[in-house]
């Protein structure tokens, strides 16, 4: 990930600083406890694509159940 890009990217929800996780290919917002994926070298900065994080590991965000089920 380009350091210049990392310096200007912020969390789309809180506008906070992001941390690059090279191994997981994600940008982490510690304030919102979200991990944004990097796909083919491109950060996907959409809240719907982010995963919730817990200390020490990342877990997928559970989709909402459809109404009426």
Swiss-Prot record:
Q: What is this protein called?
A: UPF0434 protein Rmet_0534
Source species of the chain: Cupriavidus metallidurans (strain ATCC 43123 / DSM 2839 / NBRC 102507 / CH34) (Ralstonia metallidurans)
Gene3D superfamilies in the cross-refs: 2.20.25.10
Matching PANTHER family: PROTEIN PREY, MITOCHONDRIAL, ZGC:162634
Which family does the similarity line name?
A: Belongs to the UPF0434 family.
Which sequence ranges form a coiled-coil region, renumbered to this chain?
none
Q: Which GO terms describe its cellular component?
A: cytosol
């Amino acid at each position: 990930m380009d350091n210049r890009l990392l310096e200007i990217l912020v969390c789309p929800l809180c506008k906070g600083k992001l941390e690059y996780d090279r191994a997981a290919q994600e940008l982490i917002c510690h304030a919102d406890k979200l991990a944004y994926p990097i796909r083919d070298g491109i950060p996907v900065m959409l809240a719907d694509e982010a995963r919730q994080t817990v200390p020490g590991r990342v877990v997928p965000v559970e989709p909402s159940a459809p109404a009426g089920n």
